[in-house]
């Protein structure tokens, strides 16, 4: 009597399993393990979770005296939650730094409930007063309104908006004075709707402190001349009146081309301030305080449309030594419509970053990233 076919099939299957096991015992499991770890990281990324475990990070040290800061309105709740989730996942779930939220109106119960559930640290909610969120009392209202009309007709970006001008003035000279931030040494500005595409395997606040840096950025680009035609002249007047504030090893070569110094024209390069990590004592310094007062009495936030980004950038470039400014090149960051993505192989080979380095803003003609690197190396 012959052997049943089912037994033959079973023996063949058993032989295949044993052969596979013997082969994999030599070199298979190591390869399979690598594939599994990679797939596990990719799946975590798809879920929006961090890819790194605690052992992948530098040893954790005590937190710095710092806060994450967001200026927003109640209607920004969805975008605010996107930003909070991104920062918490990529960084803060390990550190639990507090958040400070500011608004020119009272925060709604819905906003407070939703955001406080998502943050991993304490949350503080602040309503701004009329001095912080307003226009100077001595301003020429007719001139301001004419400027708004003219910029609206000329289609200057945000030229139509009074609230945008008020926001830029607040971010230039008032946020760091607010009582809610008065006891902090460092802050990290987070705007609604931004996303971080790389895990952050260290504490950037501590990095600034350990390396004696006062200001950190991730994207730099040129600004719109139509928004700030007189800002550089007003700034130069301030430096000529207060030469003691000009840092010896400043970054004039970043903001002025061809090593022309203060005699040259502003090249419009600035740090995009929707992301910045900074020592608040820089903004509280006599140099910055006097500089903002000088700008404010010229009313350029309203007669023109000065932004807080060029104001911060000019101040940092002039009042700080270049070694005190840090380029967070290893951060992955998106703010509509641009993003920065690290270009080193390791960040992508380890799945630390989930972004396309070929599309980073640094390669575009209006980026000032190369200009900054030239300034550092000069």
Swiss-Prot record:
It is a single-pass type II membrane protein. The keyword Repressor does not apply. The chain crosses the membrane at residues 7-24. The active site is at residue 276. It holds the Pfam family Glyco_transf_15. Keywords: Endoplasmic reticulum, Glycosyltransferase, Golgi apparatus, Membrane, Signal-anchor, Transferase, Transmembrane, Transmembrane helix. InterPro entries: Glyco_trans_15, Nucleotide-diphossugar_trans. It comes from the Eukaryota. GO terms for biological process: cell wall mannoprotein biosynthetic process; protein N-linked glycosylation; protein O-linked glycosylation. Residues 1-6 are cytoplasmic. Its EC number is 2.4.1.-. Residues 25-378 are lumenal. It is an enzyme of class 2 (transferase). One of its GO terms (molecular function) is alpha-1,2-mannosyltransferase activity. It is found in: Endoplasmic reticulum membrane; Golgi apparatus membrane. One of its GO terms (cellular component) is Golgi apparatus. Belongs to the glycosyltransferase 15 family. PANTHER family: ALPHA-1,2 MANNOSYLTRANSFERASE KTR1, O-GLYCOSIDE ALPHA-1,2-MANNOSYLTRANSFERASE HOMOLOG 3. Probable mannosyltransferase involved in O-glycosylation of cell wall and secreted proteins. This is O-glycoside alpha-1,2-mannosyltransferase homolog 3. It comes from Schizosaccharomyces pombe (strain 972 / ATCC 24843).
